[in-house]
């Protein structure tokens, strides 16, 4: 039925267009109602739609994304657009922001100005602020718990986090800032105590904590009980305080995202796959903490991918860090090494392992050895007269 109505409206529009003697100078206002039923458009706030249209906003995108904002009686299109323009956004940027985050128009201007001042605490200038808003409009226009947000920003600054890191957390981990500041302080204290209890020093603890929060701020959404249970379980598995400290240093807060059950499953899988003793398994885990972090299905997929490439269990055991690579990355790197005549299954996996930058550096060295001339063609020859 809907497609018939749409077809009929399109044909009527075409007939009326043919009757026109000359095309209109401006796009008709009713054109913004394309692809909507008469019933839906009759409920929309026409003043809101008209103001959005004046801002060059694609109304169809808003209808698809958050059509409910067009039904609201009270909206602030002009006010929000003015605030964005004051920060340096041009007409195109304003339109893009409103299209990506339509709920911005139902935010009260006073609350948006408060949010603006809050984010300016960690932005060098308005140019940097508007760039952040353009990239993450949803985070900026999540207007709630502003007092909590402000207190948390100040708390993270006192801890020593740089403003550039805090601004990144505001956009990527906004839930952390909606936490009561006392809860975040409690979690930070527990993290500090956990690090010190396994033998970490005060000086190293501060560096570790700042890296942890910048890499995995969601740790603050955990419960204190979960952190204690994870550490106690590792101790029950025979890990010493020093070994747990090593895991904390490598995995940062990701260790606390693991529950005892998932750790147990990963340990059992690795022990069975490598056919090793408890002591040997601990050494493997310390070399490659991913054996704890990744789930059994992920480890199994990566192990099978390596075996299909002709790599043996013994090679994987010697360089377990290769399990941090996805099967796709492994295949790509093996093809590149094969192009130089390097047979990975007959050699060491060190050249396959590492970050993208490390792999490219190793590949470059192998390539240089491959094409290096046997003698230096520009060196003078010692010729006896």
From Swiss-Prot:
Belongs to the mTERF family. InterPro entries: MTERF (IPR003690), MTERF_sf (IPR038538). GO terms for cellular component: mitochondrial nucleoid. It comes from the Eukaryota. The keyword Methyltransferase does not apply. The lineage of its organism: Eukaryota, Metazoa, Chordata, Craniata, Vertebrata. It is found in: Mitochondrion matrix, Mitochondrion nucleoid. Pfam families: mTERF (PF02536). Monomer. This is Transcription termination factor 2, mitochondrial. Keywords: Mitochondrion, Mitochondrion nucleoid, Transcription, Transcription regulation, Transit peptide. Its main location: mitochondrion. Residues 1-35 form a transit peptide. One of its GO terms (molecular function) is DNA binding. GO terms for biological process: regulation of DNA-templated transcription; termination of mitochondrial transcription. Binds mitochondrial DNA and plays a role in the regulation of transcription of mitochondrial mRNA and rRNA species. The keyword Mitochondrion applies.
């Amino acid at each position: 039925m809907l497609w018939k109505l749409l077809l009929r409206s399109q044909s009527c529009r075409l007939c009326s267009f043919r009757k026109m003697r000359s095309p209109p100078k401006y796009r008709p206002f009713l054109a913004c109602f394309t692809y909507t039923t008469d019933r839906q458009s009759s409920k929309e706030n026409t003043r809101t739609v008209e103001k959005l249209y004046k801002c060059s906003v694609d109304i169809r995108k808003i209808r698809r994304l958050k059509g409910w904002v067009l039904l609201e009686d009270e909206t602030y299109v002009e006010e929000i657009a003015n605030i964005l323009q004051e920060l340096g956004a041009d007409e195109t940027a304003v339109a893009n922001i409103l299209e990506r985050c339509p709920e911005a128009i139902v935010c009260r201007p006073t609350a948006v100005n408060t949010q603006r001042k809050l984010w300016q605490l960690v932005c060098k200038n308005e140019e940097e602020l508007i760039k952040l808003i353009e990239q993450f409009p949803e985070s900026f226009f999540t207007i709630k718990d502003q007092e909590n947000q402000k207190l948390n920003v100040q708390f993270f600054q006192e801890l020593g986090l740089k403003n550039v890191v805090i601004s990144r957390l505001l956009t990527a981990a906004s839930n952390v800032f909606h936490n009561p500041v006392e809860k975040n302080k409690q979690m930070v204290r527990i993290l500090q105590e956990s690090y010190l209890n396994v033998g970490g020093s005060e000086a190293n603890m501060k560096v570790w904590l700042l890296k942890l929060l910048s890499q995995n701020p969601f740790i603050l959404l955990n419960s204190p009980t979960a952190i204690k249970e994870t550490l106690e379980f590792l101790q029950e598995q025979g890990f010493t305080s020093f070994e747990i400290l090593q895991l904390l240093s490598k995995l940062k807060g990701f260790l606390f995202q693991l529950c005892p059950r998932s750790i147990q499953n990963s340990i059992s899988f690795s022990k069975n796959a490598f056919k090793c003793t408890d002591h040997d398994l601990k050494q493997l885990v310390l070399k490659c903490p991913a054996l704890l972090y990744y789930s059994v299905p992920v480890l199994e997929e990566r192990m099978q991918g390596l075996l299909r490439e002709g790599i043996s269990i013994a090679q994987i055991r010697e360089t377990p860090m290769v399990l941090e690579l996805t099967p796709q990355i492994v295949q790509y790197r093996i093809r590149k090494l094969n192009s130089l005549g390097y047979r990975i299954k007959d050699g060491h996996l060190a050249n396959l392992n590492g970050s993208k930058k490390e792999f490219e550096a190793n590949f470059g060295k192998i390539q240089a050895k491959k094409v290096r001339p046997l003698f230096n063609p520009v060196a003078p020859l010692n010729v006896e007269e």
